[in-house]
Amino acid sequence: SLIQFETLIMKVAGQSGMFSYSA
């Protein structure tokens, strides 16, 4: 997967408090 996309998801998920994301 794309590093930039994963970083974006991680940032959004972290701010939303919904870190149900698999690399």
From Swiss-Prot:
GO biological-process terms attached to the record: lipid catabolic process
The UniProt record lists the keyword Disulfide bond: yes
Cofactor(s) the record lists: Ca(2+)
Signal peptide: none
PTM annotation, UniProt: Contains 7 disulfide bonds.
Annotated family: Belongs to the phospholipase A2 family. Group II subfamily.
Protein's UniProt name: Acidic phospholipase A2 CTs-A1
